[in-house]
Amino acid sequence: MGEPKIVVVDYHKGNLSSVVRGLARAGAVACTSDDPEQIRRADGLVIPGVGAFYDAIAFMRESGEADAVLDAVAAGTPLLGICLGLQLFFERGDEGVPADEGADADDDASEQAGGPWVDGLGIMRGSCTRLESSRLKVPHVGWDQVHMTPAGAADPLLAGFAEGANMYFTHSYAVADDADTADVLARTHYTRSFPCIVRHGNVWGCQFHPEKSSALGQRILKNFVSIVEGAG
């Protein structure tokens, strides 16, 4: 494979140029697209971190992007989610859900307060809920430490990553306690401990923004490009 073609999935919620530039610096041919067929044909995919859970998943379903992403994942295409992109991998979220459109969570849902819920892509088990604190400011904005699990320390996405490194976060919602621990590569603590890097098969996600996290963030993007090259 030459330079891998990575499509940044455009669900019409923000400027994606910083992600495209970061992937290009990492050695990929990167572009944005909302075309389901272009998404299916990509060597690798990135779902970026802009907007609210409900609005993003609603657009992805209506446009055919959601089915295209799931088809690509089933075919073995590497996928990276950033911030909201990570959250969309999970079974459900409650950000921005109109009260008359959401559903009650089932018995397996998070014990934390939340809902009404909207279904996510369902690639990983668990929920995404709001960070709550009477002492700390929400949203969580700024640099914070990332602590790897043993699985994370051995994962190719984190090759060369320093334990306890500071990465740049900006979010009000995070993965809840009902996530499968086998999918968690790293955690961060802000108002509560939450997974900040996850993996399930050929799907990875970062709650922080690697494209805004200096040299270590760029290393993660470069590692993802290498993963895409290896899958080709």
State the predicted function of each range.
Residues 51-143:
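Cysteine-nucleophile active-site neighborhood
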Residues 38-39, 72:
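Structural alpha-helical scaffold elements that stabilize or flank donor/cofactor-binding regions
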Residues 46-48:
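Structural motif
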Residues 19-29:
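Two-component/phosphorelay signaling modules centered on CheY-like receiver
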Residues 74, 105-109, 116, 125-232:
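Amide-donor transfer/coupling interface in amidating biosynthetic enzymes
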Residues 42:
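An anion/phosphate-binding loop that grips the pyrophosphate of nucleotide cofactors and donors
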Residues 2-7:
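Extreme N-terminal starter segment of soluble prokaryotic enzymes
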